[in-house]
């Protein structure tokens, strides 16, 4: 999994935990981003359990892993996947560290400032009046379920990302489609907000 893809996962997992209800049967892209902005209200940290299903284009069977995610304002995100495909990711603003315990691999990347969490927090700190540059965004409501799809205009690893959540704010799934035809579906459960996470809860070792 590349650093850019991990950035997309971390950003949109972070944005959802406290999403407000959508009233309209259809949503504009601006309305969809405003729902994301409202997700920050009153949320200082959160944890959630995840199940990840990875469908590789060259394999018929899915690779299924479980794990957890953690987030703490203003800019720390952690994701851990359990064995047999164990990995840990720590993102602090634009500094990303990936650890593969079984392989003994540890990689650290300094991402461009515009790809860090601080930029997105600044963007979503006020009501959304314009869309972020470089993305096509679609939002819609089907019954009580909200769908938000984000497609980068610049061709890279990710083809599209879709969030599926209930209008009451419960995140259900994160779907990531890559240009190599790989597909990842992350399902969320047991989400807990404002649990009082500290710095020690975001250590890779």
Where are these predicted regions, by residue range?
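An acidic-aromatic
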Residues: 68-118, 184-185
